[in-house]
Amino acid sequence: MSDSASSTFHKINQNTDYFKKKKKIISFFDQNKEFMKKTQKVTIINLSKIILDNKIKEIDILKIDTEGFEYNVLKGIENFDFTKIKYIYIEHHFDLMINKGYKLSDINMLLNKNNFYKKYKLKMKFRKSFEYIYENEKK
């Protein structure tokens, strides 16, 4: 379960090669530089609460693309709710632009502990990012 009922977006490491490439797009926000410096708190709802509130019995594919917050999303799934999921599809960035505070090995350990094993690894073009599909071996 999630450690708190709120979370913060990750800080951007502006010294990375990836950030320098993305700077043209990100420069859109240059009119308000404070936007890039502030920390914004947002309320989160963990996946197990969504599963419970909506009486979800089975999930074929859970797609998670949260720009560096995937591990925290996965931690918001109670162990018994993992049994309802057949596949988990995640994106993982290997560049250092997003200060995540976790490694892909942390995701692997959490998913393996809940009977999910990596089936596919897809490299995304032009980025140090991969998409992974994990399968629940008990489904």
Where do the protein language model's features map onto the residues?
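Glycine-rich adenosyl-binding loop in Rossmann-like folds that engage adenosine-containing cofactors
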Residues: 1-45
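Conserved acidic-Pro-Pro-aromatic motif
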Residues: 48-139
